[in-house]
């Protein structure tokens, strides 16, 4: 009994447990849009992610989504990302990461991409500017079998509204290379939306568009649960 009492007292005075470096989320989207282009043919998709963040700035992410079968890439996508983020000034951070895109049904479509992002956070507002680059590799061949590279520059921002749990978001990007629309001199994409968050649940409604020849603009709804 004394041992039990001592354990109870020690428990009362113990320091709070440290926050876990792991987090996760699951989502249902009405249309899986990547850089403005639908990869689910306008149909709903299921998505999930597992995240790791270390106080040193190192982070890793495992993300997956269902797809509509496009060519030989199959019905699923798995992305593995690792990176490092560092604050370089008050409210200003720099992130460097690398992502490997896997399509389990076709290993020949797998490819790698690096991304550098600069983010500024001031009060309820945040803004980011980034560049993603995929070097020439087998999955990025053109119709003549030549390996090509791909570049994507993007900006995005958000502002939380006062007194209500709503955030307004916007983004724009320009892509040139293996995934662009050459006849248009590159591909532009953009989005404007809002997010409502309450506890672990988040609802989002976003208007997404692009200059891609395939597809059209769409209003995309998302329901996300985080833990």
Please state what every model-predicted region is:
Residues 1-21:
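Cleavable N-terminal export/targeting peptides
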Residues 22-24, 56-62, 90-96, 123-129, ...:
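Repeated loop/turn-to-beta-strand initiation elements of outer-membrane beta-barrel proteins
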Residues 166-206:
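Outer membrane beta-barrel transmembrane domains
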Residues 111-179:
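Detector for outer-membrane/organellar transmembrane beta-barrel domains
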Residues 192-198, 215-227:
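Outer-membrane beta-barrel "beta-signal"
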Residues 19-68:
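Short glycine/proline- and aromatic-enriched beta-strand/turn motifs that initiate or cap beta-hairpins
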Residues 42-46, 74-78, 92, 108-114, ...:
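Residues that define the transmembrane beta-barrel architecture of outer-membrane proteins
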Residues 28-34, 64-68, 86, 100-104, ...:
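Transmembrane beta-strands of outer-membrane beta-barrel pores
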